[in-house]
Amino acid sequence: MSDTSLDSMRDLRAASCGPVGSPEVTTDLSENVILTSLDDLHNWARLSSLWPLLYGTACCFIEFAALIGSRFDFDRFGLVPRSSPRQADLLIVAGTVTMKMAPALVRLYEQMPEPKYVIAMGACTITGGMFSADSTTAVRGVDKLIPVDLYLPGCPPRPEAIFDAVIKLRKKVGDEAIAERGKLEQTHRYSTVEHRMTAVDPIVDGRYLRAETQQKALAAAEAVSPLNLAPAEQPETIPAKS
């Protein structure tokens, strides 16, 4: 295209734009400018720099500690562990939560600035795990205390599973919108920690010892046992002379 044609196109554009004229954008600037929305820019900055607060109370936290090493290198996801809840936007709960620790966990969550996210890591965190049957102090799920964005099951989850959870959380952060964030807030955020215990019959009640097959096994064991000896005769005691 000749220079005359370019000049005529610029004159036509300037005439159609009115007295303000057409914006003059150089070629170098047009090739180095990225057009995006405020939501995409804000979400991209947050999902690339998640600062987790590590709340480890049991063995699940050992698997998360493995991510700090060079074998997995979780720094490539932009994760920067923080020791203060006021500087964190991601709370990772790993391990059993007891009734006594529940107020401290809720206090840490409330001190985190918005927007904030929670990952429940491990079976004990999600449902109480092996303590959910007869424990009087274990919380049956951390979601009874604080809202959970992502559940990570396992006993314990492997480091690769933790990476998968972080990737899924990044996708959730990337799809958020500033205008709709207020609609996503939960009305009833916390539930009570006073769990109603259900009385059940004891598991070990001795009935298996009274079974016929068990009685035969015990009798056979007593017959061949080398410890099945006659009781030793008690030595005769001679009263002392006065």
UniProtKB/Swiss-Prot annotation:
Query: What are the BP-aspect GO terms?
Result: aerobic respiration; electron transport coupled proton transport; photosynthesis, light reaction
Instruction: Tell me the PANTHER family matching this sequence.
Output: NADH DEHYDROGENASE, NADH DEHYDROGENASE [UBIQUINONE] IRON-SULFUR PROTEIN 7, MITOCHONDRIAL
Source organism: Synechococcus sp. (strain RCC307)
Quaternary context: NDH-1 can be composed of about 15 different subunits; different subcomplexes with different compositions have been identified which probably have different functions.
The UniProt catalytic activity note for this protein reads: a plastoquinone + NADH + (n+1) H(+)(in) = a plastoquinol + NAD(+) + n H(+)(out); a plastoquinone + NADPH + (n+1) H(+)(in) = a plastoquinol + NADP(+) + n H(+)(out)
Tell me where it mainly resides.
Answer: membrane
Q: Name one GO cellular component term.
A: plasma membrane-derived thylakoid membrane
Q: Which gene encodes it?
A: ndhK
Q: How is the cofactor bound?
A: Binds 1 [4Fe-4S] cluster.
* Necessary cofactors: [4Fe-4S] cluster
InterPro entries in the cross-refs: NADH_UbQ_OxRdtase-like_20kDa, NADH_UQ_OxRdtase_20Kd_su
Q: What is its EC number?
A: 7.1.1.-
Compartments where located = Cellular thylakoid membrane
Its biological purpose is as follows: NDH-1 shuttles electrons from an unknown electron donor, via FMN and iron-sulfur (Fe-S) centers, to quinones in the respiratory and/or the photosynthetic chain. The immediate electron acceptor for the enzyme in this species is believed to be plastoquinone. Couples the redox reaction to proton translocation, and thus conserves the redox energy in a proton gradient. Cyanobacterial NDH-1 also plays a role in inorganic carbon-concentration.
Would you tell me the protein name for this molecule? NAD(P)H-quinone oxidoreductase subunit K
